[in-house]
Structure formats: C-alpha cells, structure tokens
Amino acid sequence: MGYFQMTRNVEEIFGGVVVAPHQIPFKYTSTNGGETFLSLPFYPITGFVTINSGVQVPIDNFEIDGNTLNLGRELEPGDVVFCLFDKIMSPQDASNNAVRIYKFLSVGGETEFTPDFTAYGVQSLYIDGKYKTPGEDYNYFKTSGKVVLDTALPTGVWVVAEMSIKQNIPALAGNNGASEIGTNSGKSLAESLGTWIDTTIAIFEMTEAPSVIQTRGFYETNDGGAGVWVATGIISPSLAGTHVPSQAKVYNAGGVEYQLNVKSGFEISAKANGVKAVDDVNAETEDFVCLGEAINGITSRVKTMVNDEDLKTYLKVIIPSEYPLRIGKTSIKAYSRLKLDFQQASIYDRPSPSNRQEVTGVYMNAIERGIEDVRAISARFGGATSYSNMTLSDFHIEGGKFYGDHTTDKGVADCSTGTGLFTYNMENSSIRNTWFQGFACGRQYNRTGPGYYFDNLGNKVVGTLVPEVTSSGTGSYEGVKEWSVTAYGCRYLYLRVLSNWARFDNCKFGTYANWSSSPDGNQCEYFIENRGAGVVFSGGVIEANTAAANPTKGFVRDYARGCTFEGVYYENCLSAGWVIAIPEKSQYNRANGLFLTAIGSQFTLSSQGAPLVKFEEGYFGSYNPATGLYKTGGWETNYQYAGGVNTWAVGQPELDSGAFPHGGYDFKYGTYGIHYSGSVPDADSLRDTQEGNEFLSPYGLSVNSGILLFPTLSPAYQSNIVVWYKDLTGNFDPRNIVVGDFDNNNVSDGTSNALYRTNGFNYYDYGNGYKAAIVPYVNPRALDNRMTTSAGRKLKITVTSDAPIILKSIQAFVGGTPIFPPAIKDYVPRSQRDRIWGTMSAGSTDSGAYYGPLVGGGIFRPGDVVLPFVPFGNAALMNPASYTDNSSGFGASAETAVITGGATWGAGLAGATFTLTVESQDTINNWTTVSVPSAYLPYIFTGMPVYITANSSGGSTGLINTVRRVVNSDGTLSNKYVLYGALGAAGTTLTVSTTSSYTVRSGVSSTLTGVSGSFSASSWLGTASGDLRVGFGASGSGTRQTRYYYNGADVSAVVGSSGANALHLTGTGGITLNGSLLTSTSYSFGSASAYPANIYSQNAVTVVSDVHYKMDIVELNDAEIECAKACAKLYRRYKLKTAVAIKGEDGARYHVGTIAQLVMQAFTDAGLDWTKYGIITYESWEASDAVVETVGAVYDEEGNELVPETIMVVTPAKEAGEIYMVRYDEFNSFVMAGQEARLQALEEK
C-alpha cells in the first residue's frame, strides 16, 4: 500500500481492544478517502494509532501536532482509524503545559488522596473509567491539596485525576474538568464527549437533539468558533434554525434550544458566539452579528452586573483581529472581573436603523456600564444598593480600534454614537493599547454622585441618577489605569475622569478635525476633564494638529485636586493648556494643587501664546472700586480644607535669588529700583490700598504708560523670569516684555544682533484680570553690558495707555516656576530719598544715563527705613578706574534714615506748579474727586500725598492723601484721582506744587525709642552747619547728655547740658585733658556757686600782661597807697566751714589769707569804691533743685539682673545765696605796692 505497516494488529497486542481507565478512544471511518490528516476535538499529548487495525509507527507513519493527527498516507474509502490517547487537554492547557495525570490503583476504603506534586485544582476525575462530578462526588481543597471523596473507594479500581499544575490558567472545561460538559455523574468518558459536528450553524439543520453538541467551528471547520452547546430543555419552534447572539443560543431544526457552555475561569473566543466581520459597516440593515450582542451573550452566562456575584467569577473573552466588526444593536457591557481582549480588531460603532438615536433617543456607546445599567442595579435592590454593588471592579480592556460615526460634515443630530468607553464607579481597572476615534466623547469614567450626572454625549445633567445618590455618592471610583490609549477626532471631549488616583501613561489625545466647520459648529471646549484626586498623566501627547482644531477654552480642564502631568507634550497650543475649574461644594478634596513637569509645547505663528495654566473666570474674587467691596470667588465660596500637601507648581522651581536686586521686585516701595527710558512714566503705587491688596500681594505698581527698565544682576542661564501683573483692559500684549534687548557683539564674528533677546508670552491667567508672563533668560554670559549705558541687562516693559497694567511681582526661577508668586524676602531699600525715579536727572523729566544695578528712587511711607545710596557708573567693565560717582546727577545719601512724613518728587519733577479741578465730592466717605491735566499725570501718584499750596474755595491745603485713581469702564485709567477730605465744590481749583521733601529721623539706637530718646536725621547731622546735635527737635526742656561706660555697666563719665548756658563734665575718677583747655576772656573757670575745691598745677598761673591788651595804665595815687598799707594788716588765720563739715573741727586745717569784708572796709575807710577794683568780686544766685539721671538696670539674655538701676546726681540742689571773693594775685600785688611805699619813706628819712 506504499507504506510500512506492522504485521501485528492491536488485537494481538492487547488481546482485544481494551480501553484503560485513563485512555481516551477516538475512531474515524473514511467515507470518500483522500484524507492525509484528521482534526481532533481535543489536544492529545501521546497516543496509539491504528489504521484498519494495523499499528502505525510514530514519526514514520503519523505525527500529533496540537489537535491535528497527520497521517503517513492518504486514506482510502472505508479505512478505519482507531486511536487510544493517554491524555487530552484544552487549547489553553496545551499551550501552557498545564495538566498532569495522577493515578493509582485503590486498595479499598480510601476517602481522600493527595497527589505527589504541587497542583492547583482538579480538571477531571475518573474512578473505574467513569467521570465524577465536582461538588457532588468529590471536593478539592486548595490549602491542603487534598481531593476528598464523598464515597469510599472499592478495592482494585483505577483512580485517574487530571490536575492543574499552572495557577490561574483554567482548562477548557474550567475548574470542574475538561470533560465535564453537562453530563451526569457516573457516565463513561466516551459518553460525556457528546456529539461532534463540524460547525455550529450545522445545528440549524439537525433534527436529532443530543444533550451536548461540540462543534469544530462556528461557520466553518476550524474557523476559531469551536464551542460546546448544551441543550436547555426548552423547545421554541418559532426560533427553529436561528442564532440569538445576545443570549448565546442556537436552535436546531425542531426548535430545540442550545446554549453556549461558558463557565467561570473560561478564556473563550467571541467567535464561539458567531462573531464575524461585516461587509459594510454603514449598511442600513439589521442583518448582521452585533459584536455587543455576541460578547454580552457570552458574558451574561456567568456575569450579573452585581459586584457581589461578579467578584466570585472570572472570564476572558477574546475578540478576533478581523476587519471590520460592528456594534450596532447594543453596547458591549462591562462587568467586574472581566477581561476583553480585542487584539488588533477594528470595531465600528454603527447603530442599525432601529437602534439609531432618533428612534431610541439614546446615543449608543461602544463599551459601557452606563446610565441604564446603574438604574437597573438600583432597581434590583429597591434603591438600596451597597457600596460594592454599585462598583465596577477589575474590568480590563486590551487592544482594539473603535470608531464612532461623528465626522465634521455631520451635525450631532445626524450621528448616533455616544462615548467610546463609558463607565460609572469603575475601580482597579485598566485599558491598554486601545484606540477611540469619531465619538462624541472618547472615554468617560464617571461616578454616581448627588446633584448631577453625565450622559452619553458628555453633557452634564442636573438631577439624581438613582435614589441612592440623592444626598451622597455611592460606589467606588479609583484606580483606573491606561497605557498607550489614543482618543482621536472626538466631537466634545476625549477623556473625562472622576476616578481618584488614576493613571494615564503614554496616552494620546488629539485631532485634525475642525469641528467648528461642522453643521453645529460645536468645537471641543476641552480635550480632557479631570475631576479626580491624585491623578497622574505621564509621557503622553495632547495635540491639535491644526490651528483650527484647537479647543475653544483649553486642552485640559482640571479640578486641581493634587494631580500631576509629567513628560506631556501638547502641540499647536493656541488655547490654554490647563484650565483650573471652580471647585464644587459637594467635592471632597484629598489634595489641593496641580503639578506640571517636563511639559513640552509648540506655538504656531508668532503669537503671544495661550497661557499654560488658566483659572476659570470667577475662581478668584476681585475688588470693586465703585462699591469699595471685595467680591469673593468660587474658590473661596466652595473651598473645603484639602487635608493634604498643596502642589501648585510647574517643574520644581527654585528662586534664582541672584537674578535681580533684593531677589526681585515686589513694588512695596513703588518706583524703587526702576529705571525708565524716554519720558517719565505715568504710574501709581498701590501699597496699602484695597486695589493693591486685591490679589497675589499687598503691593502693586499701576502703570498707565511708559517704558520701564528693571535692572538684573546675574540671572542663571535658562532662568525663567516671571512677571505677574493685572491686565486692566485685556489688551496688554506680553510680547511687550523683553529681556536682552540689545546688540550683542561679544561673539567672534561680531554679527549677531540681539542674539539673546526673548519676548514674554502668556503663562498664567487667573481669571480675574491677573496674569503672568514668562520671559526665558537665554544669555549664558550674565555679565554682558553690566553697568554700562546699554539697556541689555534690563527687563524692559513697554506700556501704552490703551493697555495699562498693574505690576505685582517680578522674580526669576530655575527648574520651573510656582503658579503663585512667593513673597520676596524682607529687604531695606537703598535710595537718595529725594526723588521718585532714581534715574531721573536733576534738570529733565527724561531718564538719565545711569544704568547701574541699583538706581534708588522710590515712594516711601512713614516708618520705612532707607539705607544710604551712592550711584556709580562704569564705562569700561574691565577697568576699575572707570567707576564714576554719579551723585551729582542722580543724588546720594550717606546715612540710614527713617521716614516720618512728607513727600518728595525730586530731580526733574521738582518745582512744578499746576492746578487740579474738583469734579465732585463724596460726603459719605469724605472724598474729593479731581481731574489732572494730561501733561501732569506723571506728577500725581496714588500712594503719595498731593502738596496743595492754594485752594480757590478756601478749603484745606498742605499734603493731602490720595485715595485712588479712577478707572474707566473699559479698564483704562482716567485722569481723575480721589483725594481725601472735602476740598471744595465742583469747579474748585487746587494749586499743586512739587516742592516738598520727606521728614526723617536718622541714626541708630538699640535701647531707646521715641522722640526724646532716639536719633533723627536732623539731630544727627545738621544740614546747614554739619553740627552733631543732641536733643534737637525735642518737644521740651531737660538735660541732654552722653554717658560713658568704661566696663559696660558702670557710668564713668558724663558730658551734658542742663541749662541754656551750662555744660557739665562728670568723671568718677577724674577728667583728663590731653590738650589745652581753651576759652576766651568772656568766660570764667567756675562760678560763685560752682567752684573747684583745689587746683593742682605744675606751673604757676600765667596771666596775660601784654601792654597791647591793656589801657588806662597809671601809678597808684596816695589814697590807694594808704589803703594798700592798711590792707597789709588784714591777713588772718582761719578754717573753712566746708572742710570742718567734711573733716570735723579737729581734722580741718588752718589757712592763711584775708577776709573779703575787711578789705572792702579798708577801701571804704580810704575813701575808695571797692566795686571799681577787681580785687573783690560778688555774686548771688537763686535756689535750684538737684539734677539727677536714672541709669536703667542691665539684664542678661535670660532676664537676670546684672547691674541694678542707679540714680546719679548730675547737679546738686542749691539754696539761694550770695558770696564775696578775693582775687589773691591782685590783692597781694596791691599790698606789696603799699609796702614798697613804706620802705621808700623809711629810706628817705
């Protein structure tokens, strides 16, 4: 016969055909011949094959390949193939090598057995060749690995168990065994295999009705649709010869009903329920197999859409990679613990004519646990579901491309599809490698909450979805995960997320579609709406492939509940990137904030760009100057404490503290530190005003017009300069913010003009007029043009009157930027204090040529401390000799001062005189509105008083505070200001002068405060004479003095004054003069009431006796000689009363001298007037109290007293009195003249 055949037949080998307990027979009789292979209904491992009883040699005569038996020759008609197979497996078991045989011969009485290898379940059990039913004849216990029998074994029977040795990989027949196909316990294996036919559709013509039918395919043999169909016992003649996919049922020619055998643990192909490709996805017909019906028919065999039950079962449905498949009669339903593997299938959601939305009123989703499903669950439990029942858990999708029917040439009424994937309360579920295109919405992961719900088109419907959520939500909604999922060309939305801690990796959201060109003109407002907390988007793309495809409001609408977007690229971003939604009162925030990092973006055209982050209008509040009230925003109205870390940031920002002087500009001191170009800007300081405190900071600089230059220091390369401002009209173009605006010739070819020039572009929009612009700093050489006359090192902001702004903060950051500006660290300004604009030259209102890093100027308030300032220029960067003191042109100050009041304009603004006209009075607030001539708008500043020198109505003059500037209805700034006080009726003219200055106090005191104890500018250094003044400007009289503490605690010396003409020096250990004590002839050393006790001198007193200093020089006359002779007899011995009081009567010593009254009498006796001579002096005084000073106690850091409080007598008390004194040098000279006259008279005798 052309092939080798053994001479021994099977009967000779076995002594007759005997089937061993663990062997499975297979017999095939050829009808027409010609077969070279046979398809088996199972997957054998080994086997014994005969043809016409002749044994076939493996490899030579046959091979087993899966479920195919390849023969060594063609069969001839009538040939009989008989096989005995040792073991069979399901397709999955075959591919996973998941089954192992355990067998033994019973000894009798056994009620249990344990295999000698690790197993995870029993697939089938045969005792004495008969199949046993799990749960009835035996039970398997996973923890012990034992198989427990209901009936003890007889002696000498074979027990054969097919054990699962692969965990969680069920066999064809599931957990209960590969051969349990609806048989009764005790049937032989051969009986349990049922009837085999080639195709399922062949059942339609069958007249016989076996209990079990196994098919090798659905439409054709081996087409992948093999299945086991079990008779249900129902006969429906009207359905004879039909297939009902939604129930996975078929009917034979007599109407006998069969249902597809599906059990928990199965991995089954959707082809088993008749899934097949359609010829035309748009065909107006009902005659097609709906993929939704076919899958639902399979899943409904084990799934109920009630989580309590579904979590006990598992099912995987494999959808063929065929093109195209159609969903048109019902959506694919989502169940817990269900996996749908769509592989590479292309699936079109195209409702049939009877299922279009104009007929049903419902837009069909592709995959759903939808609105009606949730309502059905609620109805099943009488409106009292559990948290678990309302949850869709462990639902997974793999692969597939889904296409809806929305295109730009159709309006929504002409379409019938809703959302690609629509779920409520989904948790711990995933979707991977899936594509959605042409739907109203790509995916919606919703939750059942109170107040509203979302429909299939993504519309928000106000109302209650089910009774359970009238007051609070129910069902879980967290842990959704996506990998490489794409949504493309969707009409309204690509993704809505109400799932907490969801994650989306490498997902794509985008379109070429210009939906505005559709009949409805309904362009997407957003691509993504995220309401979940802790949601992460990583490594994806959000793109509008054309400018026309941009969403109308923003790419992402986010509730900022601690969500992260990292490594995301968004393209053609002409709309806002992330729009922050106003919180809802019913929303419980688990965290508060938004974190964006490594965001890539691309602009089309040379536009000002759209903001990266935008807050919905009304999110933040605003101040209404007309009412003087603050209107709260939605965030303030609906805010609930986050209970988590706030993460408002883009990237991981760190302050570039060296980018600007003081780390940035906060406008606390108005114009401080700001240069300008051209004419003086029209600006206002909003410090400590309601307008300034409206948002982001308590300060602000309102700019109506001008070119402002902000000096930089050394910004880091690629530093992000952020300018926060309020756009009063909405017309400000952030491209008017520029850095690096100069010709850079520090390159080798010298040709690169403005190489590092960058413009600002929209960055943040807070929805209440406040915005932020970002200006990248791209110059790697931060010293370029430092301190030269170029504006290259400055941030330049150009403002025009049709687009005024309020500057709030300017800072630079590396590594990212915060969404809200941090406060600048407290600093002390350095300024001249004599001009508003530090760069203004003295003779012109045009800006000067000083371009140093510090420029001074500013608008100050009482209490502000201002440090010294000296401006320097540097014409040549590398030449220190080129540094020039520019004080003559730009002013300077040399001491620290505290502003106490006043105002100053300074430099080119000083000395101007103009008039204001009263427009109206507000008697309630005591305000007066005035108009200002346009030319003098730069001379009036909110935040600084107006100096009124004349009032035509006779009203108030002097420094009058400004309240605010009037804003026009279109947001532009008017020429009207509101001043404090009732200054006159409408039409009153007020004459204004800019000649004024600040009042200040200067100096340093660490322990004293207040006027009487602190230094002030006028007392420290007098401006006229340069005096050191102590006590100048004090409100009353008193002792003024300086004290010296030699050891830090004890007073050793005091210098002071206690009267109009009194200076006292007090030294506890003496007063040392290292120099001559000089005075004029007009002053004395001591006085009648304050005289020294002793004078110690190395030399005698030297008296001026120069003839040029004297007049009326004559010799003594006779009367004077006689008086002198008499005075010689007036020397006496005496004790001083002061010495007796101190030393006592015995201790006091005698002194020799004269007595003033005796000398006076001698002059009188001689007929002379003693008052005409300087020998006797007389003084008298009024009584006075003692002058004392209290020296405070000294304490250590812990409050312990180190030195007690002491009271020091500066000047002792004095009683009223008088005193006569003698000048001994003159008295002795007078006496000597008398003695000489007596000696001469004696000699002449």
UniProtKB/Swiss-Prot annotation:
PROSITE patterns per UniProt: ICA
What organism is recorded for this protein?
Klebsiella phage 0507-KN2-1
Q: TM spans, by residue? A: none
Q: Which cysteines are joined by disulfide bonds?
A: none
Q: Tell me the InterPro entries matching this sequence.
A: S74_ICA, WH-like_DNA-bd_sf
- Matching Gene3D superfamilies, A to Z? Winged helix-like DNA-binding domain superfamily/Winged helix DNA-binding domain (1.10.10.10)
Q: Which GO terms of the molecular function aspect are on file?
A: peptidase activity
Site entry: Cleavage: S1105, D1106
This protein's GO cellular component annotations are: virus tail, fiber
Among Pfam families, the record links this protein to: Peptidase_S74 (PF13884)
Asked whether the UniProt record includes Thylakoid among its keywords, one would answer no
This one is known as Probable tail spike protein
Q: Which UniProt keywords apply?
A: Degradation of host capsule during virus entry, Degradation of host cell envelope components during virus entry, Host-virus interaction, Hydrolase, Protease, Viral attachment to host adhesion receptor, Viral attachment to host cell, Viral tail fiber protein, Viral tail protein, Virion, Virus entry into host cell
Q: Where is the Peptidase S74 domain?
A: 1105-1245
- Classification via CDD domains: Peptidase_S74_CIMCD
**Swiss-Prot/TrEMBL GO biological process terms:** adhesion receptor-mediated virion attachment to host cell; proteolysis; symbiont entry into host cell via disruption of host cell envelope; symbiont entry into host cell via disruption of host cell glycocalyx
